[in-house]
């Protein structure tokens, strides 16, 4: 991985990318995506990964907001039985664009694509140039702790997408801390987060968290029900996965297929299960516990979001007790209270429970630093 990251870092340098430049990454869930992310970090470029399902207009909006000058993409990506024409979507997004200097295209599906002379280059050709030049080791660029590491745009469900900025040191310190402690990572564990690097879950718990701990991170391309509903369990069995971190929506979807897709797979390598992205209902929690964890794997129910950078509220596997449907308590160092709509701390129960708005009262290392180009929205 180190060699491949260095090689692609040199590709970026050869194509004019410098410290502080914004690089848009629009790729499928393949190793080259993680390599591109880490290569940007190595030379101090600010990566902005865009989820592979976004439309050309959504991409154009994000390119414009980030003032991006470089794009890394693929000819296509696989999603279920479909081939997604990523390069074609990028071409549409760039109609009228005046800022993009270079588009680097990685081969994945061998989909026919158009290549604009002077702008578009093939990943593989650029790697061959680096190998020929013998420039395969690139020293990491010195960075300030508060320099931006990446911009990640929220989905825009509450208006114009906002570019959440996370910093170099604080973000990586916190993703490492939460990965090691929440999942009780042990050397040689195989960690399988089923998320997408286009979202914060993939940034934090596919790329930066596991790799900063020297862990093995397993990436998944496609959907959990293709070619059949046993896809996750086949991966767990084949690669002897130790920790599985997935979304309640995926669990509920797989529940609908019954136990047939599970029965022919050996899940005994699993030690820890996790959920992310939304609350998990008790029925799904118990199904996950009984049929996937065989009632011997702690389930960590994690609460966090793009702006927090990493997990804030969760039980810690085998250390603190979990409860079906509850994220339980803030992690050590995280200070959380409930407040009413006027900001007053809630100290009395309502119908046996404390109810209010969650407020984190003290900063943590991965706190959002700003909203790119619009600090007032932060």
For each feature predicted by the language model, list its residue ranges:
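Conserved AMP-binding/adenylate-forming core of the ANL superfamily
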Residues: 1-38, 55-60, 115, 119-125, ...
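Gly/Ser/Thr-rich phosphate-binding loop
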Residues: 127, 212-215, 242-246, 255-324, ...
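Structural core segment of the AMP-binding/adenylate-forming
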Residues: 14, 38, 42-128, 247-248
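Conserved pre-ATP/AMP-binding loop-to-beta segment of ANL
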Residues: 104-105, 111, 116-153, 160, ...
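ATP-dependent adenylate-forming carboxylate-activation enzymes
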Residues: 27-28, 48-64, 76-85, 170, ...
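A short helix-loop-beta submotif of the ANL/AMP-binding
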Residues: 22, 28-56, 66-71, 189-190, ...
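Conserved ATP/PPi-binding loop(s) of AMP-dependent carboxylate-activating enzymes
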Residues: 329-333, 344-378
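Conserved AMP-binding/adenylation subdomain of ANL enzymes
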Residues: 170-190, 200-243, 257-259
